[in-house]
C-alpha cells in the first residue's frame, strides 16, 4: 500500500520565496488563518485527497510553540476524516538537543523563518523523535461516528501523554 502524505499549512508559508514553492510542490494544502470559510474549503480539499487514497497530516494546534505542552486543538480540522470514517493516526513530535527535550528549534515569537532556519541548520545535537500512537477508531463499537470534538480530545490526550 502506497500512501502519499499531504500536509496542511498556513497560507503565509505559500508566499515565502523558495520555501513556499517547495512545500506547494510537495502537495501541501494551505489554509487561510482567521477566515471562517477557509475551514470548509480545507475540508473539501482533504475529502478530495482521501478519495485519492492520500493521507493528510495536519497540525491541529494551528500555531507553533516550544513543544513542551499542547495548545488546544481545532476540532473542526478533524471533521473531514470523521465524516469519511477514516482512522486518525496521532503522531507526537519531541524535539531534542543533545538528548534532552528542548525548545531550541521552535519557530515562535518574533523570530523570522530565515533566522530560525539559520539557527537550526547551524546547530549540532538536534534531533526529532517521531512517536506514532495507536490510531483512533473511525467508528464506535455500535457503528456510530465519534464527534470531531471527541476525536480532537482523544488525539490531544494521546499526544500529551507521551510529551
Predicted regions, residues:
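Single conserved hydrophobic/aromatic residue that forms the stacking wall/gate
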Residues: 1-9, 13
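Canonical alpha-helical transmembrane segment with a positive-inside/aromatic-interface signature
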Residues: 15-36, 41-43, 47
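A cross-family acyltransferase "interaction/gating" segment
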Residues: 17-25, 35, 54, 66-144
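Generic beta-sheet signal
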Residues: 54-60
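Catalytic-core segments of nucleotide cyclases and related cyclic-nucleotide turnover enzymes
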Residues: 144-153
Amino acid at each position: 500500500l502506497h500512501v502519499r502524505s499531504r500536509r496542511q499549512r498556513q497560507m503565509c508559508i505559500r508566499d515565502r520565496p523558495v520555501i513556499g514553492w517547495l512545500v506547494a510542490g510537495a502537495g501541501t494544502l494551505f489554509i487561510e488563518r482567521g477566515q471562517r470559510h477557509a475551514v470548509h474549503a480545507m475540508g473539501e480539499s482533504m475529502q478530495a485527497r482521501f478519495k485519492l487514497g492520500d493521507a493528510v497530516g495536519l497540525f491541529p494546534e494551528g500555531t507553533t510553540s516550544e513543544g513542551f505542552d499542547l495548545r488546544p486543538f481545532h476540532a473542526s480540522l478533524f471533521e473531514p476524516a470523521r465524516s469519511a470514517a477514516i482512522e486518525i493516526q496521532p503522531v507526537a513530535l519531541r524535539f531534542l538537543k543533545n538528548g534532552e527535550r528542548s525548545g531550541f528549534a521552535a519557530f515562535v515569537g518574533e523570530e523570522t523563518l530565515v533566522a530560525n532556519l539559520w539557527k537550526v541548520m547551524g546547530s549540532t545535537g538536534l534531533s526529532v523523535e517521531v512517536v506514532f500512537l495507536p490510531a483512533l477508531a473511525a467508528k464506535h463499537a455500535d457503528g456510530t461516528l465519534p464527534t470531531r470534538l471527541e476525536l480532537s480530545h482523544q488525539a490531544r490526550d494521546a499526544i500529551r501523554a507521551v510529551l
